[in-house]
Amino acid sequence: MSTSDKSINQWAGMNQPAKQSEPLFMIQSPPIYKLPFGDAQIILVSDGTLALGSPEKSFRGISKKEIDAQLSRHFLPTDNIVIEETVLVLMSGGKRILFETGTGVSPLYPHAGHLQTSLAEAGIDPASIDAVVCSHAHPDHIGGLSTANRRPQFPNAQIYISEIDFNFWTDAKLLGSPLDRFAALARENLLPVRDRIVFIKDGHEFLPGVQAMLTPGHTRGHTGFLLTSGNQSLYLIGDLSHHHVLLLERPRISFAYDLDPTKAGDTRAKVLDMLSTDRTAIFGYHFPWPGVGHVARQHGGFRYFPKPTRWIT
């Protein structure tokens, strides 16, 4: 069993603190953010958070001292990495396109799985979603495709994902292997909706204003998406980078849940260089809320510049 394989199963069953009832003053406002986008509109909603624990468990090829220094420079805690799960809804041409589905009802992720609540707060009926687009088949991205009784969560939606990832993660041969947990969850969520799935191809504009860009490494068929509307563009990085500091400043260090760490690092560096050169805005699924900003080259790596949020328009 490789270190990466062990980490995948550990992540799927990580010990996270149980949910606790919170006093009223701890409750935040609904996690919804609306963003104009060319001739369309983007609505960002939260599925919750994932706690990765001590950063040295997830980020490899870098010493704990270096990790602590990087995080401290950005005033971030050094004892526990917590990442966001933010789902993007594109409202364009009378269609509603949902990107990623969060963790769903899995008990493995106690602080995530809030997508349906967030959509309700935003006034979005799951039945009104026309398309669901997934960057890859990990459970924190496809876990919300099905309900607890394995019925389609988005009953009227076509589902888009790469054929490479679908075939790999739903292969029964993975059951009982080091990748068992992720494979089982992929099968539970993808197979019940197989008749609704459309496979996407690298470089194709498979929906109006939505182009697929294969970015392998994290998984074999991991895909990023370039959105365009009017004169605006936004690149959805998926899991190209899970952290807005560590994997940008040092893009070639390895991340424990990358299936092919070397290829993931090469892809990350290449895509970040492209986004920096083109000054293309990005959306990071796991970046700090709401996850929209830019990347620029800095000191041999890259730096993330979040887009200023506007709560009153």
Task: Specify the residue positions occupied by each region the protein language model found.
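Cationic, low-complexity basic patches in intrinsically disordered or flexible, solvent-exposed regions
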Residues: 7, 11, 17-20
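Residue-level marker for buried hydrophobic side chains located in beta-strands
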Residues: 97-99, 133, 159, 234-236, ...
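Conserved beta-strand hairpin/beta-sheet module of binuclear metal-dependent hydrolase folds
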Residues: 29-122, 224-238
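Metallo-beta-lactamase
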Residues: 113-124, 128, 155-214, 263-270, ...
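Active-site metal-binding motif and surrounding structural segment of the metallo-beta-lactamase
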Residues: 93, 109-160
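Cap/insert and terminal regions of metallo-dependent hydrolase folds
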Residues: 230-313
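Histidine-centered catalytic micro-motifs
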Residues: 132-142, 215-222, 283-290
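Active-site metal-binding loops of divalent metal-dependent hydrolases
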Residues: 47-48, 101-104, 137, 164-165, ...
